């Protein structure tokens, strides 16, 4: 369909084209165009840069239209499937939905971990480019970079108050950063013999745990930087360490296909969980709010066969997610659906859902009670490596090998 311009619109377009040709040094083309379009020698100042402005405006509008179309498709799908619409959903039912609110760029290599600050409207990303970046997740603004590691930063973790940030790296070190004022590295701890793959604070904040490719887990005193305990038992690379909210136990997962749960105050392994058929990449402790959904999914009621927990989720290269009752060392349910390695897990604060990130480039939202994938987000152009769910605000963040960090709004 041919678009018809008014006489005034044609004159403005011709003036804008003439300005563009003149501004970019196309003198011969400008002379020919002026002659054919019957334009005066000098264009008015108001036409300066007009063509570029209109062009960028069209691109912005196209992007907005695509976002609105994605939201409309999403709403139509929910109506057809009979899912609760936004007005009918409670905050406990809000889940991440496309399109992403922000796609943040700046890292020069794969993203290895993304986490929210426990109090402020900030998030942190770690990357194989050896840097840590801080972002405002509500505005999408880049805040600053933390530099000090000399190799890939593998994991980051905040203490409960968000005053200290711990990081670990393939450079064999663990670093503590002041997150209140200076944003400087205040301690560097050495002791592992290989790549340090994961870090986590004990809830009281006085100790940090680290997991390594050297097959050990170490406990470090924050005040002194000294290693006070070394836990051994895994037969291969220890991929991740995560501490239970009460602080008395912590879990680790490994290339040896197992998950181990340890007593924090001793070096004893409380239980070893075996069922995965490949490397276990990630683990996440379930909040208390998830107990009801997990028990129902496991076929237990409050009178008979009720599982007390605590409950732990694990994701593996065998493409499955498993939910465990740690107190008895039993796998209660298995979630199937990903087409590649499962790399990240995070529970919905309301306890009804679990979100997962995978090398199949998707984020999946799992309805725990019904043991099914209720939503798939085609999140990134490459492997999804990490995910986090904010405990108080309706946001999810994800990181990828495509070097982007994405912020997803829950609704």
Curated annotation (Swiss-Prot):
Record carries keyword Manganese: no
Entries under InterPro entries matching the protein: Dynein_regulator_LIS1 (IPR017252), G-protein_beta_WD-40_rep (IPR020472), LIS1_N (IPR037190), LisH (IPR006594), PAC1-like_LisH-like_dom (IPR056795), WD40/YVTN_repeat-like_dom_sf (IPR015943), WD40_repeat_CS (IPR019775), WD40_repeat_dom_sf (IPR036322)
SMART domains linked to this entry: LisH (SM00667), WD40 (SM00320)
GO-annotated biological processes: border follicle cell migration; centrosome localization; centrosome separation; chorion-containing eggshell pattern formation; clathrin-dependent endocytosis involved in vitellogenesis; dendrite morphogenesis; establishment of mitotic spindle orientation; germarium-derived cystoblast division
MF annotations from Gene Ontology: dynein complex binding
Repeat region (WD), residues: 106-147, 148-187, 191-230, 233-272, 275-334, 337-376, 379-411
Domain LisH, residue spans: 9-41
Coiled coil: 56-83
One Pfam family this sequence matches: LisH_PAC1
Location relative to the cell: Cytoplasm, Cytoskeleton; Cytoplasm, Cytoskeleton, Microtubule organizing center, Centrosome
GO cellular component annotations of the record: axon cytoplasm; cell cortex; dendrite; dynactin complex; dynein complex; growth cone; kinetochore; kinetochore microtubule
Keywords, in A-Z order: Cell cycle, Cell division, Coiled coil, Cytoplasm, Cytoskeleton, Microtubule, Mitosis, Repeat, Transport, WD repeat
Cited function: Positively regulates the activity of the minus-end directed microtubule motor protein dynein. May enhance dynein-mediated microtubule sliding by targeting dynein to the microtubule plus end. Required for several dynein- and microtubule-dependent processes.
PANTHER family xrefs: WD REPEAT-CONTAINING PROTEIN POP1
Record family assignment: Belongs to the WD repeat LIS1/nudF family.
Comment block on domains: Dimerization mediated by the LisH domain may be required to activate dynein.
Protein's name according to its UniProt entry: Lissencephaly-1 homolog
Natural source organism: Drosophila virilis (Fruit fly)
Gene behind this protein: Lis-1
């Amino acid at each position: 369909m041919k678009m018809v311009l008014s006489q005034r619109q044609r004159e403005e377009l011709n003036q804008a084209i003439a300005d563009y040709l003149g501004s970019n040094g196309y003198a011969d083309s400008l002379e020919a165009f002026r002659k054919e379009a019957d334009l005066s020698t000098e264009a008015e100042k108001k036409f300066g840069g007009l063509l570029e402005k209109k062009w960028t405006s069209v691109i912005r509008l196209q992007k907005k239209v695509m976002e609105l179309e994605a939201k409309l498709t999403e709403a139509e799908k929910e109506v057809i499937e009979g899912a609760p619409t936004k007005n009918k959903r409670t905050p406990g039912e809000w889940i991440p939905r496309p399109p992403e609110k922000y796609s943040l760029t700046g890292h020069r290599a794969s993203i290895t971990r993304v986490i929210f600050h426990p109090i402020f409207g900030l998030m942190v990303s770690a990357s194989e480019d050896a840097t840590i970046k801080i972002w405002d997740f509500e505005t999408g603004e880049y805040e600053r970079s933390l530099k000090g590691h000399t190799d890939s930063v593998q994991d980051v973790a905040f203490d409960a108050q968000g005053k200290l940030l711990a990081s670990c790296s393939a450079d064999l070190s663990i670093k503590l950063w002041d997150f209140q004022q200076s944003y400087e590295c205040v301690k560097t701890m050495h002791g592992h013999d290989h790549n340090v793959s994961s870090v986590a604070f004990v809830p009281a904040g006085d100790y940090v745990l680290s997991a390594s490719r050297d097959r050990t887990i170490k406990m470090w005193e924050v005040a002194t930087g000294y290693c006070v305990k070394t836990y051994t038992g895994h037969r291969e690379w220890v991929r991740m360490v995560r501490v239970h909210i009460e602080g008395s136990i912590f879990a680790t997962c490994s290339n040896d296909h197992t998950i181990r749960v340890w007593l924090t105050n001793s070096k004893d392994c409380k239980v070893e969980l075996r069922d995965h058929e490949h490397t276990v990449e990630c683990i996440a402790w379930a909040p208390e709010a998830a107990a009801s959904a997990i028990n129902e999914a496991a076929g237990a009621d409050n009178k008979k066969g009720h599982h007390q927990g605590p409950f732990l989720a694990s994701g593996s290269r065998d493409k499955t997610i498993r939910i465990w009752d740690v107190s008895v060392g039993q796998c209660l349910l298995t979630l199937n659906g990903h087409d590649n390695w499962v790399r990240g897990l995070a529970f919905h604060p309301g306890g009804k859902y679990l979100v997962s990130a995978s090398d199949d480039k998707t984020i999946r939202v799992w309805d725990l009670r019904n043991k099914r994938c209720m939503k798939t987000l085609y999140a990134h152009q490459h492997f999804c490596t990490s995910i986090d769910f904010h405990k108080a605000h309706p946001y999810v963040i994800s990181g990828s090998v495509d070097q982007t960090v994405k912020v997803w709004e829950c609704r």
